[in-house]
Amino acid sequence: MPFLVACGAGTTDIDGSSTVFPITEAMVEDWGDSIGGSARLVIGISGTGGGFKKFCSGDADINDASRPIKASEVERCAENGGEFIELPVAIDGLTVGVNPDNDFVQCLTLEELHTMWAPESEGEIKRWNQVRSSWPDERLQLYGPGVDSGTFDYFTETVNGEAQSSRGDFTSSERDNVLVVGIAGDRGSLGYFGYSYFVENQDILKMVAIDSGNGCVFPTDETINNGTYAPLSRPLFIYVSKESWAEQDVKNFVSYYVSYERAGLLRDLGFVPFPEQVHDLVLDRFQRGLVGTIFGGERPQEGTVEEILSANQ
């Protein structure tokens, strides 16, 4: 169901990532309160990929995205004559969680995650002791985002080497709260989702540390921001239609959204804000209406978010 914040003459349609949704929802509510409810914004959740389909077809003004835009999506937008402004808004860490009654999993290597989630593991890896022999011979039940989710794309590329490359026999949903409820109710479960959903549900889930070669690291504000939780930390984005950018309500709302003054709100939601200078670069990019992708497409640029933004202002 879409989320409607306020009433007015114009409508701004926002769709996309379930991971970014809580940020956008909170920004819409805060901004709506600050202007006395004189604008109308409707938010849906179609997943990052599903949102880009609507966005590039002209059916959404803003797309929430938990990954950068793909080359095929850039092409689809171009075919429909749509330009866009790409704005990183926060940092997230993909969090692996298990049922709180699981007393044997404390840390997983990337290779063990691959063993669980590889396409060739479908129908084959079904017990915990198949992942690590010292673990009990108990059923392994996997939960994850749907294939239209940017979280699914990012996780599969990081763990399996190719986006969308995954076993298919897992319980999937575009709504992270469905995954949380499933894991919380199943002792043999494991799943992944954005860091904020763990923070919100840490009383009913158990977080697993990840060893990417330098020891076991839990996702925290500090490890996500300083890079020690890499490669499972990532920037989150909103994409704004250049046509919609010309509308004053959109300019005002997005300027409010990306300002460093919202850093406290991001922390309250379980996300990690960028340093102030990065938020300033993002705001400048939006206010100048700089179009195109510098983080995605055929040739994504390398470096930190700040380095990439600074080189393209």
Each language-model region and where it sits:
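Flexible loop/hinge segments at secondary-structure junctions
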Residues: 7-313
